[in-house]
């Protein structure tokens, strides 16, 4: 039962767990009492804080304070001030003795002294003015935070979000947001229109505020990019914005159109007449237009001769099929060529042959892929060093070392997993290639899911044939049951559990007798509890990956990750994971499997990289191993917010990765997301075994449902034959 809202003050003397959105610890009050607390706040040991919230009785941890608001308590008596100065983790050069001198001399006048006469504080403490300058910055920042938090907590902003805003706007944060809350969308990553609009409504911002209408229009365009589209039809954009903004006026659509025309006139958005009038982000429009010009120009160039090419193909590629031979030949004689094919069609062997012939010709070959996992797999199977595209371009998190003025130095550049390459990355890549000196070979599987980002590069190129294109259609004899059954999905067929068996394992399992979602969930947990390791010999963390189409619901990634974390921590480490409060992110513990959700160039960890927590401290600091590289993640940092549990992942998130065993959840409750390219992409993540788990109708419907993923792209128009003429 919850009590009335109260406020408590004190010093944090212990932190049990801490993250950007949740902390638990122990507070020592000015009277010397100890209080256990937990809530949506971020604290560190020795912080002087004021917590607001309610007393609750937890079923496991007993009576504790549920914190809903945190302020840095700077209204300190001399004892508290000395403790704050001596123990604050960011204050350097002031130990207990110097802190006591400052507290005894200034007491309640410290705020005025540190703001207006910091030299006097330096003189009393006998420390350099630079040290007091750093202290002054921390003190004022905490004051600014308190001022901002006291105003903004009522609007639902968290401690972590307010900290970010104070760092951006300082003491003007409240005035800035009250004047125009939509500035959050422009200045702070992660603040989308809907979140900001909720804040604006609480502030009483009028619905017809110009910045709101403009922000809503831009949000609709950016939402299209998030869906993979590069443009929105003009009339459709007006309808979307009108539905989003709900302005409650008869002429709302006309008002929105006036603001849209203004955004176009200012160059904030761009419009173009295709089959219909469309609107787009100008950067994406420019990138696709320039890419189209690059591909068209390349397509106009004829082949260049390679001496004794047929003989080289006979020697190095004696086992090539005619299709593969054509792809290898194209790679060696054209400035841009494309090879695409499904699982088991022989793309890897063709790439290996390209590398072998290039070595004979003393040509420098570079291999790259969108993700670290895909690059490592390419390197392992081809036997030639490979890197991520970002590393190839020399990206340091801010700038690219390779561009048109400093192009990539290679004779042949092979890019694998091109289905994952979105328009911005493709544009960056071709900006860094001199096609008069370097041939680019694009390799992928056009039946896989398109990229997470905007565009549909691989399919647009396959459809247009603007560059020499080879589609490998023949499944090679050595492909095996797993790849044959995976390819059958493209024809709408789900084959039953395989008869063939290697040791205790089969390459293909279909478990389709569960119509109830909870039964599917129980079966999944049973596989981890009793089958995968004990009977099939798999490492439960490193060999097995659960794939599911959704994030929400009993069979979504969020709930499955919590359940699998609890099961595997108990099974493998004997650790009982505490309950995860509703609405909170689960904490990480040593042994957890995690995935990076956004690129982190400072740590050198890319989106989609799977890692393992080596160590997790009580304060929330993590040591994580990614493919042999160990990184340190501080609690409450942006790096920490980019990590998620990875026992279960969406299919898109692991595109380009492979695992010995993939468990693919396909249930009728997900039917609105089902289509055969999704299922095909999921099963082709497996190297040895696939386990299809769900109900028969759900699995078969997923394979039967054809979804033409026609994205709105400029390339699809610009590369049409008439556009190339």
Predicted regions and their residues:
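Accessory, non-ATPase domains that flank or precede helicase/AAA+ motor cores in DNA-metabolism machines
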Residues: 1-304
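ASCE P-loop NTPase motor cores of helicases and related translocases
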Residues: 226, 231, 239, 243-247, ...
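Short basic/glycine-enriched coil/helix segment immediately N-terminal to the Walker B
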Residues: 400-411, 431-437, 541, 654
């Amino acid at each position: 039962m919850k009590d009335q809202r109260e406020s408590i003050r004190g010093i944090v003397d212990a932190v049990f767990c801490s993250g950007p959105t949740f902390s638990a610890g122990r507070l020592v009050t000015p009277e010397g009492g100890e209080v256990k607390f937990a809530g949506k706040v971020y604290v560190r040991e020795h912080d002087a804080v004021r917590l607001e919230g309610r007393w609750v009785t937890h079923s496991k941890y007993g009576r504790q304070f549920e914190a809903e608001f945190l302020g840095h308590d700077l209204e300190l008596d001399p004892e508290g001030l000395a403790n704050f100065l001596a123990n604050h983790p960011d204050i350097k050069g002031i130990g207990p003795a110097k802190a006591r001198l400052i507290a005894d001399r200034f007491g309640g006048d410290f705020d005025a002294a540190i703001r207006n006469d910091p030299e006097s504080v330096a003189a009393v403490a006998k420390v350099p003015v630079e040290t007091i300058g750093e202290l002054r910055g921390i003190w004022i920042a905490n004051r600014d935070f308190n001022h901002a938090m006291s105003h903004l907590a009522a609007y639902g902003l968290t401690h972590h979000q307010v900290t970010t805003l104070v760092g951006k706007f300082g003491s003007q944060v409240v005035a800035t947001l009250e004047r125009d809350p939509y500035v959050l969308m422009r200045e702070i990553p992660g603040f989308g229109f809907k979140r900001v609009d909720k804040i604006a409504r609480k502030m009483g911002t009028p619905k017809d505020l110009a910045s709101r209408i403009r922000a809503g229009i831009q949000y609709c365009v950016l939402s299209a990019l998030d869906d993979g589209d590069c443009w929105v039809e003009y009339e459709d954009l007006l309808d979307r914005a009108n539905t989003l903004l709900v302005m409650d006026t008869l002429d709302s659509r006309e008002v929105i159109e006036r603001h849209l025309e203004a955004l176009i006139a200012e160059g904030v958005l761009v419009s173009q007449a295709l089959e219909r009038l469309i609107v787009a982000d100008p950067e994406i429009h420019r990138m696709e237009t320039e890419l189209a010009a690059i591909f068209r120009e390349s397509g106009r160039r004829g082949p260049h001769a390679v001496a004794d090419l047929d003989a080289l193909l006979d020697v190095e590629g004696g086992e090539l099929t005619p299709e593969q031979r054509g792809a290898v030949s194209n790679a060696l004689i054209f400035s841009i060529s494309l090879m695409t094919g499904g699982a088991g069609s022989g793309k890897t062997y063709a790439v290996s042959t390209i590398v072998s012939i290039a070595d004979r010709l003393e040509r420098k070959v570079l291999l790259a892929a969108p993700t670290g996992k895909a690059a490592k797999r390419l390197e392992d199977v081809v036997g030639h060093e490979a890197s991520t595209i970002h590393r190839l371009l020399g990206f340091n998190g801010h700038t690219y070392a390779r561009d048109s003025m400093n192009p990539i130095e290679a004779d042949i550049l092979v890019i694998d997993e091109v289905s994952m390459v979105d328009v911005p990355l493709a544009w960056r890549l071709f900006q860094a290639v001199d096609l008069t000196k370097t041939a680019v070979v694009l390799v992928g599987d056009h039946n896989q899911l398109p990229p997470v980002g905007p565009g549909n590069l691989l399919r647009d190129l396959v459809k247009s044939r603007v560059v020499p294109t080879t589609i490998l259609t023949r499944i090679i004899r050595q492909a095996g049951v797993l790849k044959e059954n995976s390819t059958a999905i493209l024809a709408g067929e789900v084959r039953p559990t395989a008869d063939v068996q290697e040791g205790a394992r089969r390459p293909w399992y279909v478990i389709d007798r569960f119509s109830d979602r909870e039964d599917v969930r129980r079966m999944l947990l049973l596989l981890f509890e009793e089958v995968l390791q004990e009977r099939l010999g798999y490492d439960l963390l490193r060999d097995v990956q659960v794939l599911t189409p959704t994030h929400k619901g009993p069979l979504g990634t969020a709930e499955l990750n919590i359940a699998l974390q609890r099961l595997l921590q108990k099974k493998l480490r004997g650790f009982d994971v505490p309950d995860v409060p509703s609405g909170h992110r689960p904490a990480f513990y040593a042994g957890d499997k995690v995935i990076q959700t956004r690129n982190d160039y400072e740590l050198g960890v890319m989106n989609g990289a799977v890692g393992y927590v080596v160590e997790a401290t009580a304060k929330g600091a993590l040591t994580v191993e990614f493919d042999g590289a160990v990184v340190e993640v501080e609690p409450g940092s942006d790096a920490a917010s980019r990590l998620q549990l990875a026992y279960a992942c969406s299919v898109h998130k692991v595109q380009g990765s492979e695992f010995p065993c993939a468990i693919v959840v396909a249930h009728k409750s997900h039917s609105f997301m089902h289509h055969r390219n999704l299922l095909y992409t999921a099963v082709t993540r497996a190297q040895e075994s696939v386990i299809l788990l769900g109900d028969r109708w759900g699995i078969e419907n997923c394979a039967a449902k054809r979804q033409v993923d026609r994205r709105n792209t400029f390339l699809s128009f610009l590369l049409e034959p008439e556009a190339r003429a």
